[in-house]
UniProtKB/Swiss-Prot annotation:
Enzymatic reactions: Endonucleolytic cleavage to 5'-phosphomonoester
Protein name: Ribonuclease 3
Gene Ontology BP term (one): regulation of gene expression
Pfam families attached to this UniProt entry: dsrm, Ribonucleas_3_3
Gene: rnc
Domain of life: Bacteria
């Protein structure tokens, strides 16, 4: 069995070796190997296919939602962090284990960088669309992103959890959130931990390969924690 077969099994489709390799080729690898084609064109295509599929699904699931509400729901599903999370769970080792990265990128944790994983996920979706058409691509997307679609009404503006959290705390008169960030590890392999403080109280914590990723995860955890507290208060009222 091909070492990439578990990835194809997780996607639920077959792809020609040449097309699959292209979808997995990051620009850092292409540069180190004499300027090979990269997955960026497929990423561009996959982004459009993903956006259309999710938009169509939300439009039909929520007939009473306004355009603005639908845009927020889509942002909670189609964003770098959500794509990266899907990529990490795609198969044993995640998508990162199959990406073709340059040595420099690989040595700095590129296989787990959210931006690279998100781009790779979109590239695969673009490849599926090219090989199998929109119907199959749609089936794959709805299966992989189904849980996110179901949870979209409770997720907040996942495109930018920090902004979403700031809007929530402002609406509740809690003041602006602040972030306490620490890091561990050598310069080439740092891990960042962020803790959100709102009204002198520590809430969510997030860990990531970059300060931005850690803060976004911490903001997401805090948003959800505050939402749970609000729901509990309404239930007991």
């Amino acid at each position: 069995m091909s070492s990439r077969q578990p990835l194809l099994d997780a996607l639920g489709v077959e792809l020609p070796d040449e097309l699959l390799s292209l979808a997995l080729t990051h620009r850092s690898y292409a540069y180190e190997h004499g300027g090979l084609p990269t997955n960026e064109r497929l990423e561009f295509l996959g982004d459009a296919v993903l956006g259309l599929t999710i938009t169509d699904a939300l439009y039909h699931r929520h007939p009473d939602r306004t355009e603005g509400d639908l845009a927020k729901l889509r942002a909670s599903v189609v964003n770098t962090q959500a794509l990266a999370d899907v990529a990490r769970k795609l198969c044993d080792g995640g998508l990162g284990a199959h990406l073709l990265l340059g040595r420099g990128e690989a040595n700095t944790g590129g296989a787990d960088k959210s931006s690279i994983l998100a781009d790779g996920m979109e590239s695969l979706l673009g490849a599926i669309y090219l090989q199998h058409g929109i119907d199959t691509a749609r089936e794959v997307i709805l299966r992989l992103f189904g849980a996110l679609l179901d949870a979209a009404p409770t997720l907040g503006a996942g495109l930018d959890w920090k902004t979403s959290l700031q809007e929530l705390t402002a609406a509740r008169g809690m003041g602006a959130p602040s972030y306490l960030v620490t890091s561990t590890g050598p310069d080439h392999d740092k891990e960042f931990t962020a803790v959100v403080v709102v009204a002198d109280t520590e809430y969510g914590t997030g860990v990531g390969r970059s300060k931005k990723e850690a803060e976004q995860k911490a903001a997401a955890a805090t948003w959800k924690a505050l939402d749970v507290l609000d729901s509990a208060a309404q239930t007991s009222a």
